[in-house]
Swiss-Prot record:
Belongs to the methylthiotransferase family. MiaB subfamily. It comes from Chromobacterium violaceum (strain ATCC 12472 / DSM 30191 / JCM 1249 / CCUG 213 / NBRC 12614 / NCIMB 9131 / NCTC 9757 / MK). GO terms for molecular function: 4 iron, 4 sulfur cluster binding; metal ion binding; N6-isopentenyladenosine methylthiotransferase activity. This is tRNA-2-methylthio-N(6)-dimethylallyladenosine synthase. It catalyses: N(6)-dimethylallyladenosine(37) in tRNA + (sulfur carrier)-SH + AH2 + 2 S-adenosyl-L-methionine = 2-methylsulfanyl-N(6)-dimethylallyladenosine(37) in tRNA + (sulfur carrier)-H + 5'-deoxyadenosine + L-methionine + A + S-adenosyl-L-homocysteine + 2 H(+). Monomer.
Amino acid sequence: MKKVYIKTFGCQMNEYDSDKMADVLGSAEGMVKTDNPEEADVILFNTCSVREKAQEKVFSDLGRIRPLKEANPDLIIGVGGCVASQEGDAIVKRAPFVDVVFGPQTLHRLPDLIESRKQSGRSQVDISFPEIEKFDHIPPAKVDGGAAFVSIMEGCSKYCSFCVVPYTRGEEVSRPFEDVLTEIAGLAAQGVKEITLLGQNVNAYRGLMSDGEIADFALLLEYVHEVPGVERIRFTTSHPREFSQRIIDCYAKLPKLVSHLHLPVQSGSDRVLMAMKRGYTGLEYKSIIRKLRAIRPDLCLSSDFIIGFPGETEADFEQTLKLVRDCEFDFSFVFIYSPRPGTPAANLPDDTPHAEKVRRLEALNEVIEAKGYAINQSMVGTVQRVLVENVSKKDATMLAARTANNRVVNFAGHPRLLGRMIEVKITAAFPHSLAGEALTSESA
């Protein structure tokens, strides 16, 4: 039986796409996944170009597997994802042993690209943007667990000045409404209890319905809520510009919509937000959070921040710190600005020393982590309903589960609980996780 090894970089959308690569090759070629590249017949890198470090790591990894190709010329090596879209033929020029290069929108063509490579003896490159075609060619997912991702739209039309996504994944294109619901119903029939709706700007969803009308994201949430078997709904990543009152109202009327929201703000400075072309102010962002917390006081909030954007002053950074304290984020992802070729921001002058950017990053992380730890500590003694996801990475005798507000809870339990929703009592808090004890018997 042939085997495929897939290494994934970057976002949850890439994780979803990697699963679909495996599904496509499994259906067309009978391949199964392996965690060992040395035993693989096909090695794929699903890449990310959001930051320079992630992009360069791909080429480092390609260099490390080159000896495998030299030892086995029949080994197929492929590069997909956003670096593939951005670099195209340049990847083959830099690493001539790469056999196939494909973009996020052409992963469904992998079997044909591999066959063309074998027949022609030449590297194959397909980084076109055939919009939503790939979903028509991907076989139904077979899942092993209680949670699953469902991509509902692709691309981004916001063109933030720092971001490569519109250039690597194309503009916003939404999947048809009924197609999304059919996929979710199929997953629920396989025992999936938690659905995470995915998109670069997931709340910009505008899906065509069978009657010719257009469904917005709020309507999709309402329909997903009614799918039998679905107990939890998450979504990521959303954009503040698209966070309508209709979506806010969903938090009041849809109990399956979890009390966790990832809403990237990037900066608390209006001047920086304008330079980033984000399309909102810090006050407008805080207004969204205020409305949500009036409905869901227990809302867990996470975000993304870019530190050291060109021209960011100490005063700008202080405004970011103030926004963080005002919004009380549970956790966030903080990065030093990384200029991406081809974006407007790449040409902006940047005179802030790197050491100062590091200082700001550490200061912001300190504030965010202190608040997150305090929230974790406040959960000790409470009973939480969790979805048991996997065996703990640190202790094979422990299970790892996730609360509705996105906390990882480690507890002693039998693997037969995997994929189930159970109740646990929180017994201890740590900076990035919780400990608990199961209140549900293993045979219940």
